Amino acid sequence: MKNFKVIQMRVLLPVLLLSLVAANIWAADPPVEITKKDRCPVCGMFVYKYPKWVALIVFQDGGYYFYDGAKDMFKHLFNTAKYTPGRSAETIKEIYVTDYYDVELIDAKTAFYVIGSDVLGPMGHELLPFKDRESAQEFLEDHKGKSILRFQEVTPAIIESLDRRQ
């Protein structure tokens, strides 16, 4: 009987761990796929042309908007009613940005953003998102970045300063 419990644990534990990992991976998938019709509500550009720069906001009612960079996503976030009348920032469910190195959507609220670098996005000077501080620091050093910000540190004034650099 004791051997049976050991065998059960040796089989069930890996299956359980694999299930948890798979559930975590599936939970990280974006809720919608980008199409050729999706346009940035801030600048009007077709977003599918810029996969390295895509950002995404999903609302509680399932509505969503893609952006051609984190900068336009923040502009929308700071003035939701202007870019999407009838919506408010309080009804946002999820926000994603694309990790610059991995080109995968990541949670915008946990990302690290490099500003002031020599790399330009589709709309000029951009915030470049990274999933971890180490990657952001490496990029900052390689591309003459000025600083690394967290989501809550990005302000309308910072976004305006990026636009003025153009």
Segments and roles (model prediction):
Residues 1-2, 136:
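General N-terminal leader/first-domain-start detector
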Residues 2-13:
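Bacterial N-terminal signal peptides that target proteins for export
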Residues 12-22:
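Bacterial N-terminal signal peptides
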Residues 23-27:
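Sec/Tat signal peptide C-region and signal peptidase I cleavage site
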Residues 28-86:
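N-terminal secretory signal peptides
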Residues 59-60, 95, 156-157:
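Acidic helix-start/capping segments at beta-turn-to-alpha-helix junctions
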Residues 88-152:
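Thiol/selenol-based redox catalytic cores and closely related redox-interacting motifs
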Residues 144-166:
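N-terminal targeting pre-sequences for secretion and organelle import
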